Amino acid sequence: MATMEDMNNMSGEITLPGFRFHPTEEELLDFYLKNMVVGKKLRYDVIGFLNIYQHDPWDLPGLAKVGEREWYFFVPRDKKHGSGGRPNRTTEKGFWKATGSDRKIVTLSDPKRIIGLRKTLVFYQGRAPRGCKTDWVMNEYRLPDNCKLPKEIVLCKIYRKATSLKVLEQRAALEEEREMKQMVGSPASPSSTDTMSFSSPQEEQNMPLPLLQHVLKKESETEDMVVPKQEKITNQLVLKDTNKSTCGTSLQMPFGKEKLPDLQLPMLSDWTQDTFWAQLNSPWLQNFTPTNILNFY
């Protein structure tokens, strides 16, 4: 049993500035996982025991004992019923999907000695088989199949895959293209004052009565708005033509007279309709007097 002094020393070493936990794959399998399976308690408890499938990956960093960019957990292997013993890797908001086949891990001192297997999984948001791929990655380490030790516990390493600048630019371009397609596919509807829409007789027959009454009311209001506008334009054109004709005339009235005298015409009677009497009754013959004749000669 660890004493209080050992626990204080352990806590002090872990929290020392510059301390990092970056074990190799051989150390994870041959030391940490194997000792956990056989029940040997380690002096420094740096890897906690947690069922990570009860949490989403973005919540796991806060549940790990140590780690800044990589987080480690001992995880129980939960079997999924009715699927051939395949482990259940489903969370509340997504699922972990395996990529590729398992990779064998060997020791550096003896490359022929297999100490474990590594499975790589990627987290998808949504429900299988569909889902949105994320940048959360998990390496699941387990003991080899020929190992006589229990295999109900695995060691998982959680981290986020670094995204290159090229991939980020491609994502931004795709997002911009998608937004442009949405803008082109759904143009803004014109206002009611700019565009008038009238229903055909066939459409009016197929409309429900409340909807038809609403459409007819809107059309009537639109016509009431258009007619005064047309009358206003006509009055403006007439006024403009009147001003133009008034300003453009060259006729000047004599000084002291505001209007021209009326044109004097002879009065017509019934007997003036005769051609002969009309000639004798002309204004020139009426003024033909003896005095005028003497003046003429």
UniProtKB/Swiss-Prot annotation:
Pfam families: NAM (PF02365). Keywords: DNA-binding, Nucleus, Stress response, Transcription, Transcription regulation. GO terms for cellular component: nucleus. Residues 15-161 form the NAC domain. It is found in: Nucleus. The keyword Nucleus applies. InterPro entries: NAC-dom, NAC_dom_sf. Coiled coil: none annotated. PROSITE patterns: NAC (PS51005). Its main location: nucleus. Induction: Induced by abscisic acid (ABA) and cycloheximide. Induced by tunicamycin, azetidine-2-carboxylate (AZC) and osmotic stress. GO terms for biological process: regulation of DNA-templated transcription. Residues 189-201 have a biased composition (Low complexity). The keyword Transcription applies. Widely expressed. Residues 178-204 are annotated as: Disordered. Residues 115-167 bind DNA. Gene3D superfamilies: NAC domain. GO terms for molecular function: DNA binding. PANTHER family: NAC DOMAIN-CONTAINING PROTEIN, PROTEIN CUP-SHAPED COTYLEDON 2-RELATED. Involved in response to abiotic stresses and promotes cell death and hypersensitive-like responses. May act downstream of NRP-A and NRP-B in the endoplasmic reticulum (ER) stress and osmotic stress response that mediates cell death. The NAC domain includes a DNA binding domain and a dimerization domain. This is NAC domain-containing protein 6. It comes from Glycine max (Soybean).
